[in-house]
Amino acid sequence: MAEKTYPMTLEEKEKLEKELEELKLVRRPEVVERIKIARSYGDLSENSEYEAAKDEQAFVEGQISSLETKIRYAEIVNSDAVAQDEVAIGKTVTIQEIGEDEEEVYIIVGSAGADAFAGKVSNESPIGQDLIGKKTGDTATIETPVGSYDVKILKVEKTA
């Protein structure tokens, strides 16, 4: 079975690599040290510090594994390879809900780079899926779990 690929920009991949390095070189050794200290307290059957450290170790190792998979199967997307006015990963898109005055600006990223607070939406999110491939002037219906709404794409530009 073919592995899933993770479309992302080069910047997103570099961010994941830094995060992985931090986990391996800083967090993992910290957790190992906490386990070592907790073991020194004696009886492990009633040692809450030991259990907490082991839980944290499992969490950190899970994060490491997830990041390694995303990096290994990263598919670097070159936004220059698509039309200048076409919505794609690595592009900034300005939209306006039909019948509303307010404009919204989103940066389309791979799932690894999503950050709603920074206006970065994943290509796998409802809004990302519904905008990918559309061009300036197009309308799109955004399907969300709570309903749908129509938007007009006002501007598409390469993300700086």
UniProtKB/Swiss-Prot annotation:
Q: Which residues form a coiled coil?
A: 1-72
SUPFAM superfamilies, from UniProt?
A: FKBP-like (SSF54534), GreA transcript cleavage protein, N-terminal domain (SSF46557)
Sequence similarity: Belongs to the GreA/GreB family.
Q: Which organism is it from?
A: Streptococcus pneumoniae (strain Hungary19A-6)
Keyword Transcription regulation part of the UniProt annotation? yes
One example of a Gene Ontology biological process annotation: DNA-templated transcription elongation
Q: What is this protein called?
A: Transcription elongation factor GreA
Q: Which Pfam families match?
A: GreA_GreB, GreA_GreB_N
